[in-house]
Curated annotation (Swiss-Prot):
Lineage: Bacteria, Pseudomonadati, Pseudomonadota, Gammaproteobacteria, Enterobacterales
NCBIfam families per record: PRK10807.1 (NF008070)
Knocked-out gene: effects: Growth of the pqiAB mutant is inhibited by 1% lauryl sulfobetaine (LSB). The pqiAB mutant is also sensitive to caprylyl sulfobetaine.
Function: Forms a tunnel that spans the entire periplasmic space. Could be implicated in lipid transport between the inner membrane and the outer membrane. Binds phospholipids. Required for outer membrane homeostasis. Contributes to membrane integrity.
Assembly and binders: Homohexamer. May form a complex composed of PqiA, PqiB and PqiC. Interacts with PqiC.
Transmembrane segments: 16-36
Encoding gene (name): pqiB
Protein known as: Intermembrane transport protein PqiB
Coiled coil start-end: 437-464
Chain ranges on the Periplasmic side, renumbered to this chain: 37-546
GO biological processes: intermembrane lipid transfer; membrane organization
Origin species: Escherichia coli (strain K12)
Locations listed in the record: Cell inner membrane
Length: 546
């Protein structure tokens, strides 16, 4: 067997092959696609919200002015399970929308004071609205609001803070009014743990922000105002919005100048009504103590202190108990009440430089006293009335108790009426009622006897009237009248009796005429019937003596 061992040829293997072109190109394209994707991918933000109702990853869009600017990628619970974290991706080039004051909120159907909004989401679904910011740099996390902000961050105007001791007076969205015209809205309502009160943030739109000065006052506007005066009742009603939900009004009180503009976030006090604002202008006061023997039920702090209808001050504390004040409950127990006399109310009458304490002391010496009177019969509210009572015991000076000057008091109002009623009852008890009752009994007995006699008389008269003779009396009277009528007919003109009577009267008249000379003579000379009367001559005229 023949073997043929040839020499092997050794050749160098090529490292590159055209086969690798396809995967390399594919890898380059993939890398370019990835680079293009990430380089053109918009920023990612995290939205914090209490719940993700209606929000779905990959479906819920983010819009700004009705233009799609992003989409929600996922919604997951936070690690502490207290809130929801929503991962959202904005479109490329939308980085300019993100600033510190950028606002996100959920748009969905809502019914509020301004009407119904978000009806379009019934078909398209819930979406997130983005309001671009303008201040600060981009943030990674934002709060997602349940409703749109009442005022945009870039809106022109001013934000102020109202402090109140009562909760629930205002709600976000309530109107802010100036003399009935809406100039802003209530934005937020929070509880301040440091001040221990409720803080409301208000936004006043421009150009009305110039109306907010250091002298303005804010008060709760209920939408309806009832004023009962001696002229009648006056009712004022605001708009339907303020009537249903209320609001807040502000203005410069009467007597103050317009004031100076304030800085943003300036704090003001929220008053209950406009009347309490006028009372708050009197900051200077003098404390006095009053001890009332009457019941103070119905007397509240803030009640007026008046002198014949003119307000002089305010009730401060009811009742007022100092640490070292001790009293024993007995029939002479008196309740202390602290009042404040406000000198600024008396400047018009006393002058700017008058000493109110000295003047009040003089009035107390002249009989000025305090009493409780009813201010409202429906609610039973009381007020302190100051007036002169000359019959009260005189005082030589103002007494003090526990560092407070004392104003003497007298019983007034219902207590005074009760006292007068008791005095009247005492006088009635002191009357000699027994003799009066005996006399009245005797008079009543006499009256009864008189009534019996009168009844007997009436019975007798009834018997007489019922007798036959009394029944015949009208018939007899009619017969007599007929006879009289017939007799009178005989004296009618033309009858014989009438003619005879006329002739007799004529003869009598003739006889009287003939007797007149005789009667005249007898009148001149009574003895003319015995002696002949001489005729007097007529007087002759003579010449007057010269």
């Amino acid at each position: 067997m023949e073997s043929n061992n040839g020499e092997a040829k050794i050749q160098k293997v090529k490292n590159w092959s055209p086969v690798w072109i396809f995967p390399i190109v594919t890898a380059l394209i993939g890398a370019w696609v990835l680079f293009y994707h990430y380089s053109h991918q918009g920023p990612e933000v995290t939205l914090i919200t209490a719940n993700a109702e209606g929000i779905e990853g990959g479906k819920t869009t983010i819009k700004s002015r009705s233009v799609d600017v992003g989409v929600v990628e996922s919604a997951t619970l936070a690690d502490d399970l207290t809130h929801v974290e929503i991962k959202a991706r904005l479109n490329s080039g939308m980085e300019k929308l993100l600033h510190k004051d950028t606002v996100f909120w959920v748009v969905k159907p809502q019914i509020g004071r301004e009407g119904i909004s978000g009806l379009g989401t019934l078909l398209s679904g819930v979406y997130i609205e983005l309001q671009p910011g303008a201040k600060g740099s981009k943030m990674d996390k934002y709060d997602l609001l349940d409703s749109p902000p009442l005022a945009p961050p870039d809106a022109k105007g001013i934000r102020v803070i109202l402090d109140s001791k009562k909760a629930g007076q205002l709600s976000p969205g309530d109107p802010v009014l100036f003399r009935g015209y809406r100039v802003g809205s209530v934005e937020t309502s929070t509880f301040d743990t440091q001040k221990r009160n409720i803080s409301y943030q208000l936004f006043i739109n421009a150009p009305y922000d110039r109306l907010v000065t250091n002298n303005v006052r804010f008060w709760k506007d209920s939408g309806i105002a009832v004023d009962l005066t001696s002229a009648g009742m006056r009712v004022e009603m605001g708009s339907l919005t303020t009537l249903l939900s209320g609001g807040v009004s502000f203005d410069v009180p009467e007597g103050l100048d317009l004031g100076q503009p304030v800085a943003p976030k300036t704090a003001f006090v929220l008053y209950d009504d406009q009347k309490s604002i006028q009372d708050s202008l009197y900051t200077d006061h003098i404390d006095y103590l009053m001890f009332f023997k009457d019941s103070v039920r119905g007397l509240q702090p803030g009640a007026p202190v008046e002198f014949r209808g003119i307000r002089l001050g305010t009730v401060s504390k009811v009742p007022f108990f100092a640490p070292n004040m001790r009293q024993t409950f007995n029939d002479d127990y008196r309740i202390p009440v602290l009042i404040r006399i406000e000198p600024e109310r008396l400047k018009m009458q006393l002058g700017e430089n008058a000493d109110v304490v000295e003047h009040l002391g003089e009035l107390l010496k002249r009989g000025l006293r305090g009493s409780l009177k009813t201010g409202n019969l429906v609610t039973g509210a009381l007020y302190v009335d100051l007036d002169f009572y000359p019959n009260t015991p005189a005082i030589t000076g103002i007494r003090e108790f526990n560092g407070y000057q004392i104003i003497p008091t007298v019983s007034g109002g219902l207590a005074q009426i009760q006292q007068r009623l008791m005095e009247a009852l005492d006088k009635i008890n002191k009357l000699p009622l027994n003799p009066m009752i005996e006399q009245a009994t005797s008079t009543l007995s006499e009256s009864q006897r008189t009534m019996k006699n009168l009844q007997t008389t009436l019975d007798s008269m009834n018997k007489i009237l019922a007798s036959q003779s009394m029944q015949q009396l009208p018939t007899d009277m009619q017969s007599t009248l007929r006879e009289l009528n017939r007799s009178m007919q005989g004296f009618q003109p033309g009858s014989a009796a009438y003619n005879k009577m006329v002739a007799d009267m004529q003869r009598l008249d003739q006889v009287l005429r003939e007797l007149q000379p005789v009667l005249k003579t007898l009148n001149e000379k009574s003895n003319a019937l015995v002696f002949e009367a001489k005729d007097k001559k007529d007087p002759e005229p003579k010449r007057a003596k010269q």
